[in-house]
Design a protein with these regions (language model features):
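Transmembrane helices and adjacent periplasmic/lumenal helix-loop junctions
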Residues: 148-166, 244-249
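Primarily membrane-embedded glycan-assembly and transfer machineries that use lipid-linked glycans
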Residues: 2-145, 167-304
Length: 304
C-alpha cells in the first residue's frame, strides 16, 4: 500500500514573529546601550557624582559651588546642594559609589512602579544617568511615591510634571521648603552668575536635545504636547521643551511613551524627544475639541 507523499512544510515563523513583536524594543534598547557603554567605558564611572559632590563640599565649606572638573562646570540651581549634603560628607570614593547605586536603584524602582517589562532597565537614558551617578533616575520614582518635593530639590524642573499631574500638596510643600531654605543656599551667587552658568550648560550639552536646540521645533512641540493630553504632556514636557537638556532627562518621559515613541526618544539626537511627543499625540487621535478640553480639564482634588 502506498501512502501519498507529504507536502514539505517550511519553518513555522509564528514563534519568530511573536518573539520579535515582544522583544524588538528590548533589542533596540540593548543595541543603543551597548554602543553608549563602549564610549563611556573608556572613561571613569561617576563623573556627574564627583562634580555634584565636589560642588556640595565647596558650599558646605563656605565657598562658591560653581566649580569646574576638567571642562565641566557645576551649574545646577542651589536647591540641588541640600539633599546631596549627607552624601558629600562621606569620603569621595564612597560618595560616588552611593550616587551610582542610587541611580541604579532609581531606574529599577521606575520599572517596578510602572510595572514595565524587566528589559526596560536597558532604556539608554537610565544607563547614561546610572553610569554618571546622576540623580536624574530618582526623580520619577520620587514623584510617583509622593516624595515630589525631594525630586524638585534634586532637579528643579521636576515641578513641571508635578504641576501638570495636579500634585498640589507636593507643590505647596516644595514652595514652602524653597522659602525656608533660601537664606541658607547661595541664591545670590547663582543669580549673579546666571548668565555664565546658562552658557556653561548650553556648551556642555552641545545646545541640548529638546526643541530649544532647533527653535523651529518649539511650536511643533507645544502643539504635540497639547494633543497628547495633560497626563502625558506632564511627563513629556521637560524632555521636549526644557532648555539644554541632556540625554538622561528623557527618563521623565517613560510613563507617557508608546513603544515607537520610546524607540525614538532613546536616540540621543536633537529633536528626538519632539518626534516622540508627536508619535504619542498621533496615537491619542484627539481630534474633537470636547475630547481635547476633557484631556486638559483639571481634576477636582488632584493628587498628593
Amino acid at each position: 500500500m502506498t501512502h501519498p507523499a507529504r507536502t514539505a512544510r517550511g519553518p513555522d515563523l509564528r514563534l519568530v514573529r511573536a518573539w520579535i513583536d515582544r522583544y524588538w524594543l528590548a533589542v533596540w534598547f540593548g543595541i543603543i546601550s551597548a554602543m553608549r557603554l563602549s564610549v563611556l567605558s573608556t572613561g571613569e564611572a561617576g563623573f556627574d557624582a564627583r562634580l555634584y559632590l565636589k560642588a556640595t563640599r565647596a558650599w558646605l565649606a563656605g565657598a562658591d559651588p560653581w566649580i569646574l572638573i576638567d571642562t565641566q562646570r557645576f551649574a545646577a540651581p542651589p536647591p540641588t546642594l541640600l539633599p546631596l549634603a549627607p552624601i558629600a560628607i562621606l569620603p569621595e570614593s564612597i560618595g560616588v559609589a552611593v550616587m551610582i547605586a542610587l541611580a541604579v536603584v532609581g531606574a529599577v524602582a521606575t520599572v517596578r512602579i510602572l510595572r514595565l517589562p524587566w528589559w526596560w532597565i536597558l532604556f539608554p537614558p537610565f544607563l547614561d544617568a546610572a553610569w554618571n551617578g546622576n540623580p536624574q533616575n530618582l526623580l520619577l520614582p520620587l514623584i510617583l511615591v509622593g516624595a515630589g518635593p525631594l525630586a524638585a530639590f534634586l532637579k528643579i524642573y521636576a515641578v513641571l510634571p508635578m504641576a501638570l499631574t495636579l500634585r498640589w500638596r507636593a507643590l505647596l510643600v516644595t514652595g514652602a521648603a524653597l522659602l525656608v531654605t533660601a537664606p541658607f543656599l547661595p541664591w545670590g551667587s547663582y543669580i549673579a552668575q546666571f548668565g555664565d552658568l546658562s552658557t556653561a550648560l548650553a556648551t556642555q550639552s552641545d545646545g541640548g536635545l529638546s526643541a530649544t536646540a532647533l527653535p523651529w521645533l518649539i511650536p511643533v512641540a507645544f502643539a504635540a504636547l497639547l494633543f497628547a493630553g495633560r497626563e502625558r504632556a506632564a511627563w513629556l514636557a521637560v524632555p521636549a521643551l526644557w532648555p539644554t537638556t541632556q540625554w538622561y532627562y528623557s527618563t521623565l518621559a517613560v510613563p507617557a511613551l508608546t513603544p515607537l515613541a520610546a524607540a525614538v526618544i532613546a536616540i540621543p539626537v536633537p529633536g528626538a524627544a519632539v518626534v516622540a511627543v508627536v508619535i504619542v499625540a498621533v496615537t491619542r487621535r484627539t481630534t474633537s475639541r470636547d475630547r481635547l478640553v476633557a484631556d486638559w480639564r483639571p481634576g477636582i482634588l488632584g493628587r498628593p
